[in-house]
Amino acid sequence: MSLMQFSGLLVVWLLSTLFIATLTWFEFRRVRFNFNVFFSLLFLLTFFFGFPLTSVLVFRFDVGVAPPEILLQALLSAACFYGVYYVTYKTRLRKRVVDVPRKPLFTMNRVETHLTWVILMGIALVSVAIFFMHNGFLLFRLHSYSQIFSSEVSGVALKRFFYFFIPAMLVVYFLRQDSKAWLFFLVSTVAFGLLTYMIVGGTRANIIIAFAIFLFIGIIRGWISLWMLVAAGVLGIVGMFWLALKRYGLNVSGDEAFYTFLYLTRDTFSPWENLALLLQNYHNIDFQGLAPIVRDFYVFIPTWLWPGRPSIVLNSANYFTWEVLNNHSGLAISPTLIGSLVVMGGALFIPLGAIVVGLIIKWFDWLYELGNREPNRYKAAILHSFCFGAIFNMIVLAREGLDSFVSRVVFFLVVFGASLLVAKLLFWLFDSAGLIHKRTTSLPQAQVEGKL
């Protein structure tokens, strides 16, 4: 890459970043937080944060990358995607009407809410315990990270249930919403994330998500400033780099440490070059249509229920890894959101996907506002827990693609909804048995004496 080509890419990158960052800043000033703000920051991180890292790798370490015209296509496709997404998100589909009282779809009381978070926590802890009994601490047993996907590891399906510890702790926080509950959420979820990191063999998702939710709650409540958020972000990047070194068993120093930091940070937070690789091999892609979305559900179907279930799930990530890159190392390479759309339908699917994503984020913001307006604090805690709990799925959406997002959000919805139903059933059984008693609030002694 020549300096002239780099200069052209830099101009496009600066204009695109300024465009998205400006819209995000205006939205932040208007509402402080909603899921449009979160997705916009996530989109910036995924598709634009990696460009400076790639530039240093190219000019400092002479690392090979895709041709400049392909990198330009990747940057422009990301900017155009966001433009279509933003217009879709801001377009009102129907006239705003004055809220009229309507019968709620469901309601929650104190006992049902506490039962819900206990059930969610139980699902996570029992899954971790069973996985640990089968495999022990994989971080200290396996020689490479790719081995966690091999036949040496049993009960892999249980990992999908670990994440429900975070929604459980979110319910606990939203019932109190003070600084102590906020700090308790951080300590409990990060401790659980470190435990799963050691048990699973290097999976950092639970730690990243817990830390991100903690920061956004702090921004919403005004407990941390934007500068503190930036400082925490830098700390998070360094922390994720250290965990990655431990995961891959790397011992580096000097220039090698700097080089390793650059490419691991880029691959962890901003796999934008994967989109460039996909566009570079555009002519080799056999467009898959909506099949990757259907196939991604296969992993949630146990073999005892479907004995003939395909052992290889050809979702967009696996198609990109195996068929496009011819990489059979055992790890799936993230195609990114835009890359998954290209795999499914080529360039035509990029604006269509942007419209779909705009509607998805609009729905989550509607649900979030519903929780903000809800007078029943127990129901509000459940709604907010569901919305913030889905942050993991939004990260999957940006990094892995639309197919992975759809299957995971449906799974999350089913498990979360089933926990609610079980909590309501248990409450009905306890109430029928006479085990539920109304809480009586006693008046302070001074007020009692004043009434005598």
Curated annotation (Swiss-Prot):
Coiled coil: none annotated. GO terms for cellular component: plasma membrane. One of its GO terms (biological process) is enterobacterial common antigen biosynthetic process. The chain crosses the membrane at residues 6-26, 37-57, 63-83, 118-138, 155-175, 181-201, 207-227, 228-248, 341-361, 378-398, 410-430. It comes from the Bacteria. It is found in: Cell inner membrane. InterPro entries: WzyE. Pfam families: WzyE (PF06899). Pathway: Bacterial outer membrane biogenesis; enterobacterial common antigen biosynthesis. It is a multi-pass membrane protein. Keywords: Cell inner membrane, Cell membrane, Membrane, Transmembrane, Transmembrane helix. HAMAP family: WzyE. Belongs to the WzyE family. Probably involved in the polymerization of enterobacterial common antigen (ECA) trisaccharide repeat units. Probably part of a complex composed of WzxE, WzyE and WzzE. This is Probable ECA polymerase. It comes from Salmonella agona (strain SL483).
